[in-house]
């Protein structure tokens, strides 16, 4: 009887369930979208119960549609949109407010106040993060401050906090397990990544009672089992948890110090495994936990690119220059260069290493001879220049020269982007056969905990290369192009509308 690992990939706009076999191959997929709520400008919320319903639906669908019995599921792995925050009543199981999503800016004033009080470096030193609304801690404080009676309930021990992984494990286990893993805890602004414990000083600054917080566990461990009615009477081990970007790092088998993966999604995320050392960044990177396994944690450096694949969506939906994302490749390859055109897609500011929230998108180098093909090519090239910006910051902070770049996300299907990426970073780019690396990482973590796979070496054998892109551009051309990009970014930062 063939066994499978069921991976739950709970994302920002949809929930997915994916079955993986022992070779790490996909045996079935189900997906369901859920509603986004925007109560005010800059606020983004989800209904945690709707997320739970969507997860139940896709788990049921993937099992039924692929004729898999519940007793064929060896374990469940969970990967989740990071930082999104749920607070719920531990007696009724009902959330007391919507889940506040990672993108939501409704806690900006809390962050500004803490910065004015001089606490930014305290948070940076202990958590490796920036004092920003992106992270979970200020979201918890906002809920306790703004929902009537919440603070009193929290102090009486009646409320629980969790990121989405915690919420799903609690529900799946029938309220038995209130846990998170090291990778998700490291995104809360409340967890000391050096001591590996919730930090009393930070909790006091955020006025969050410690009794609300989940127990922090390794990323690969049996946390509990499903209760009867979810799996037709089967008690299936819930055995692996990691935040989405860390799960992708694990799914790419980036197990060694210096291994790097880059995800080209709506935005871009690059993570470097820095081994057992938390590398302090001087270049605007985040220091975070990659995963905890085998009794120790691996740390990572993380760089964020705000606009990656969404630049291609902009070409399609905003400018109507292309009818589909794949069409961008054929247009880009009709010309040999951009003829000096640069697109800086700072639609919502610039991420690592600039962290300039006021910058806005800009185009440079236009001439009467500029055609649609040049413009499209320049937009695709911008993804690669931004990736080099982050990679250079990583090499500077870590002292490690990146030997190869493993890639995933929607834009990796574009061969032009992959080749230009290799050229502009002067490093081989490796595209895997299975590009569902986030879900695969969660499956690997769960599979290790239940003996489905024996070791990380066993897992590494399952990682298969689809295509390798080696750099072909000569150094003079590469550096000339990159100098042009840096000038374009500099000019973008100078021009600010009032």
UniProtKB/Swiss-Prot annotation:
Gene Ontology terms describing biological process: glycerol catabolic process; glycerol metabolic process; glycerol-3-phosphate metabolic process
Regulation: Activated by phosphorylation and inhibited by fructose 1,6-bisphosphate (FBP).
Signal peptide start-end: none
Xref: CDD domains: FGGY_EcGK_like
Disulfide bridge partners, by residue number: none
Modified-residue entries (Phosphohistidine), positions: 230
Keyword annotations of the record: ATP-binding, Glycerol metabolism, Kinase, Nucleotide-binding, Phosphoprotein, Transferase
Pfam family, one: FGGY_C
Subunit structure as annotated in this protein's UniProt entry: Homotetramer and homodimer (in equilibrium).
Protein name: Glycerol kinase
Source organism of this protein record: Staphylococcus aureus (strain MW2)
